[in-house]
Design a protein with these regions (language model features):
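Nucleic-acid-interacting cores, centered on viral/eukaryotic replication and modification enzymes
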Residues: 83, 91-93, 100, 129, ...
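A short beta-loop-beta micro-motif enriched in histidine and acidic residues
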Residues: 78-79, 94-112
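Catalytic core of Fe(II)/2-oxoglutarate
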Residues: 119-179
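Non-heme Fe(II)/2-oxoglutarate
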Residues: 1-79
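A short glycine-rich, His/Asp/Glu-containing loop-to-beta-strand
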Residues: 71-95
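A general secondary-structure signal for short beta-strands and their flanking turns/coil
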Residues: 6, 110, 159-161
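Short, conserved beta-strand element in jelly-roll/cupin
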Residues: 86-88, 104-122, 167
Length: 179
């Protein structure tokens, strides 16, 4: 295991926001907005940045993320943007790093800020550099996914794990805020 930078803050969204975001993800799954992820079974996602699916509540939370992570003026990541991720029982995210030519060619880093909207138990926790990170519901965690291998355990839940992911382009000298 190697060291990695991580910022995690509890209660980033309210209970009301949690309920609205959870219902929105479930509705989007039922409407076919969230598509099966080709990287594994029981995984669904939708890139929502710049689409009609990026609702006012998502934009409001995005602004709060910009303030929290002190990234005013940093653009939304052009490769992954903002994503809704839903994983059902038996799904998992494989170990990987998010390395894209855009970031290397432009000498920038990709900051990913994730909100744990729903998690039924600890199998929903992210794994970063081989360490299980305890992220409670309504918390946000941010890290540089091109520098840290990340994944999940096999998700064992009755209700899906729902995470909203907000990606930004930050300068190479960017450091995560200390909690």
């Amino acid at each position: 295991m190697s060291n990695f930078d991580l910022s995690c803050s509890k209660n980033f969204i309210t209970i009301e926001e949690q309920e609205e975001l959870s219902q929105l993800a479930v509705d989007y799954l039922q409407q076919g907005v969230l598509q099966a992820n080709p990287r594994g079974p029981h995984r669904y996602r939708a890139k929502i940045w710049g689409t009609e699916y990026c609702t006012p509540i998502i934009m409001k939370i995005g602004k709060r993320i910009i303030e929290h992570f002190k990234i005013k003026g940093c653009p939304v990541d052009p490769h992954l943007g903002w994503i809704i991720s839903l994983i059902e029982k038996g799904g998992q995210i494989h170990k990987h790093r998010d390395k894209y030519a855009y970031h290397e060619q432009n000498n920038v880093k990709h900051l990913r800020c994730n909100i744990m909207v729903t998690r039924e138990n600890s199998t929903a926790n992210p794994v970063i550099e081989g360490r299980i990170i305890d992220v409670p519901a309504r918390a946000i965690w941010g890290f540089i996914p091109s520098e840290s291998e990340h994944s999940t355990q096999l998700v064992d839940v009755e209700k899906p794990r729902i995470v909203y992911q907000f990606g930004f382009v930050v300068p190479m000298d960017y450091t995560l805020p200390v909690n």
